[in-house]
Amino acid sequence: MARPDDEVGPAVAPGHPLGKGYLPVPKGAPDGEARLVPQNGPEALNGGPGLGPLIAGAQGGPQALIAAEEETQARLLPAGDGEDVPCPACPPRTALSPRRFVVLLIFSLYSLVNAFQWIQYSSISNVFEDFYEVSPLHINWLSMVYMVAYVPLIFPATWLLDTRGLRLTALLGSGLNCLGAWVKCGSVQRHLFWVTMLGQILCSVAQVFILGLPSPVASVWFGPKEVSTACATAVLGNQLGTAVGFLLPPVLVPALGTQNSTGLLAHTQNNTDLLAHNINTMFYGTAFISTFLFFLTIIAFKEKPPLPPSQAQAVLRDSPPEEYSYKSSIWNLCRNIPFVLLLVSYGIMTGAFYSISTLLNQIILTYYVGEEVNAGRIGLTLVVAGMVGSILCGLWLDYTKTYKQTTLIVYVLSFIGMLIFTFTLNLGYIIVVFFTGGILGFFMTGYLPLGFEFAVEITYPESEGMSSGLLNTAAQILGIFFTLAQGKITTDYNSPEAGNIFLCAWMFVGIILTALIKSDLRRHNINTGLTNIDVKAVPVDSRVDPKPKVMVSIQSESSL
């Protein structure tokens, strides 16, 4: 029997009933003239066009009668040009492109550099405070500008992704990242803090075109058995950049001189020149790498593979472009209660991670004076452990498809990890902080791809870029709030524990919201055939593509 998700269905064996939603088509009828019509529609009830006495319509629905097996054959017509041949002779509808690994690697690398530029100031905040002669709040804003820029720009960036595609979005992200890196190279003088801020603003705009791409890249290029792992790998690139941002700056730009009575570093002229040289080395190295990756993006990053990698992507490709509405997509997501709950809970978790990452150097140095290098290494441990968690979570999702259960368990374990990290900071053993930071990072950072993939599942067939963009918007807004609030609480009470407890309270709220999410795995149901698909429209002649297209309505009948 022909199936709705087949591009070219096999002929129905004589004497067997037709599939739901299909009418028999006379053998030899031209593909461009025959149509798929709605079940219970007027043409279906009247026997369909051009079928004459072959079909008798009853009041309860059309009854397909094959008058002569030699003369008539029931089949599902192909979406484009094709011959009436059995399914085994047809080309496969879906296929995996070897280029998918190249695209994923390029994206992960320039995402890595962008994340490195985000955290490179905060990981040695005391050094930059003294070099530019500014307050800790100024350095914190070099991190928070990433969050501020994201909120107003995510909607035009998402519109661009949905209307112009992956390639242009990738070029903008990589290009602006490169431009920002070069601007910073001109800021290595003590009175040019505003120039380094300008470069950071450009990098923060680039981030808008980067953070929302893991899910679209994974969905467009990877098959259903590897999509979660691919998304986790794409997120991994960003996490690795954060890890490198904690590791390299303390090594490339070590603190020089001795502290004076104000707590700032007292520099001689020679020390200042050496510090400027070290900062220059870091900035120029970043700029050269960013330039190389930008040219690599131009050469090798393609829009999409020749054939869709999954049935879910094939259905979306068959939908005519006229059917997509940006405003309707936003409205549909806002009315999706499970997505709204995930939106807030994801924002809490990721915002807490942003706050911890931004303030980690200040938190560690409160208890362990002079341990700038180890503070960076603790940040590295936190992120590397999270990278391992991300990959394991992605593999687990591809194997089990237990999105809600996994998300909830990881959320609870992140909360427990945060409590352990908070109440072991003041023990006086920095090795303990390494260990507890690793536990915290494994679960907190490992949660990030879970949120992306869970959102795509419960919002399909809405744009992956839209759902990812809204998740990141919530994360940026709450990241700004948490960073400012935690920083002030830590300063007022002179205790990082108070600020961490503030984050723990919010994470507990996130656990409750996650538990309330209804798990309706729409994309998974399409790929496994658990969702009822009714072909309910005739082929559409698009102004863009002259080939007929089939419009599909998805009706989910199960909630896993």
Swiss-Prot record:
Q: What residues bear Phosphoserine in this entry?
A: S542
Tell me the superkingdom of the source. Answer: Eukaryota
What is reported when this gene is inactivated?
Lack definitive erythropoiesis, have craniofacial and limb deformities, and die in midgestation. Cells exhibit structural defects in mitochondria and upregulate integrated stress response (ISR) through EIF2AK1/HRI kinase. Embryonic lethality can be partially rescued by choline supplementation. Conditional deletion in hematopoietic stem cells does not affect hematopoietic stem cell function. Mice with Flvcr1 that is deleted neonatally develop a severe macrocytic anemia with proerythroblast maturation arrest.
Entry binding sites for choline: Q476
| Glycosylation sites (chain numbering) | N270
Q: Which portions of the sequence form the region Disordered?
A: 1-43
Residues at which ethanolamine binds: Q207, Q476
Q: Which reaction does it catalyse?
A: choline(out) = choline(in); ethanolamine(in) = ethanolamine(out); heme b(in) = heme b(out)
Which regions of this chain are Cytoplasmic-facing, per the record's topological domains?
A: 1-92, 164-165, 222-226, 301-336, 401-402, 459-466, 519-560
Which UniProt keywords are listed?
Cell membrane, Erythrocyte maturation, Glycoprotein, Membrane, Mitochondrion, Phosphoprotein, Receptor, Transmembrane, Transmembrane helix, Transport
What Gene Ontology molecular-function terms does this entry list?
A: choline transmembrane transporter activity; ethanolamine transmembrane transporter activity; heme B transmembrane transporter activity; heme transmembrane transporter activity
| This protein's record includes keyword Cell membrane | yes
Q: Does the keyword DNA-binding apply?
A: no
List this protein's GO terms for biological process. Answer: blood vessel development; embryonic digit morphogenesis; embryonic skeletal system morphogenesis; erythrocyte differentiation; erythrocyte maturation; head morphogenesis; heme B biosynthetic process; heme export
Q: What is this protein called?
A: Choline/ethanolamine transporter FLVCR1
Source organism: Mus musculus (Mouse)
